[in-house]
Amino acid sequence: MTPELNLKSLGAKTTYIFEYNSQLLEAFPNPNPNLDPLITLECKEFTSLCPITSQPDFGVIFIRYIPKDKMVESKSLKLYLFSYRNHGSFHESCINTILLDLVKLLEPKYLEVYGDFASRGGIAIKPFVNYAIKEYQEFKEKRLLNAK
């Protein structure tokens, strides 16, 4: 029997929000908190707007995390990332905000966000940021040294 999860997005009619909204994120209890899986989530169609020119920016967002007590619900993550569509922000700021919002929601053991943005003006921007609780600081440092 499936426990009551109180999720708002999964299984419901989808309402798309076109402006950044961290309240779209939802979590559910980690069914195996004693394990340390490294979970990878990939959003191949991330878009936001340049805060200066209002031109669209396109990228692939990679989120990797080791959950503690909560895991992110994937449809809510999709809607959250979609909410950046009309949000004006630099690539680095988007990646930092995604990390901070997920850390606040999940309180994970470890979490990283990497953005692989399409070139504009011949330069591709690929920001990486990570977070770890005290027991995972060494892992965090190694991941930072080996970031894409």
From Swiss-Prot:
EC number: 1.7.1.13
InterPro entries: GTP-CH-I_C/QueF, NADPH_dep_7-cyano-7-deazaG_red, QueF, QueF_type1
Pfam family for this entry, one: QueF
Stretches assigned to coiled coil: none
Catalytic residues (positions): 50, 57
Alphabetized UniProt keyword annotations: Cytoplasm, NADP, Oxidoreductase, Queuosine biosynthesis
First and last residue of the signal peptide: none
Gene Ontology biological-process annotations: queuosine biosynthetic process; tRNA modification
Gene3D superfamilies xrefs: 3.30.1130.10
Localization terms from the record: Cytoplasm
GO cellular component, one term: cytoplasm
Pathway: tRNA modification; tRNA-queuosine biosynthesis
The keyword NADP appears for this protein: yes
Residues reported in the UniProt entry to bind substrate: 72-74, 91-92
Catalytic activity: 7-aminomethyl-7-carbaguanine + 2 NADP(+) = 7-cyano-7-deazaguanine + 2 NADPH + 3 H(+)
Molecular-function annotations in GO: preQ1 synthase activity
Family classification: Belongs to the GTP cyclohydrolase I family. QueF type 1 subfamily.
HAMAP family documented for this protein: QueF_type1
Role, per record: Catalyzes the NADPH-dependent reduction of 7-cyano-7-deazaguanine (preQ0) to 7-aminomethyl-7-deazaguanine (preQ1).
PANTHER family: NADPH-DEPENDENT 7-CYANO-7-DEAZAGUANINE REDUCTASE
Identification of the protein by name: NADPH-dependent 7-cyano-7-deazaguanine reductase
Source organism of the structure: Helicobacter pylori (strain HPAG1)
Originating gene: queF
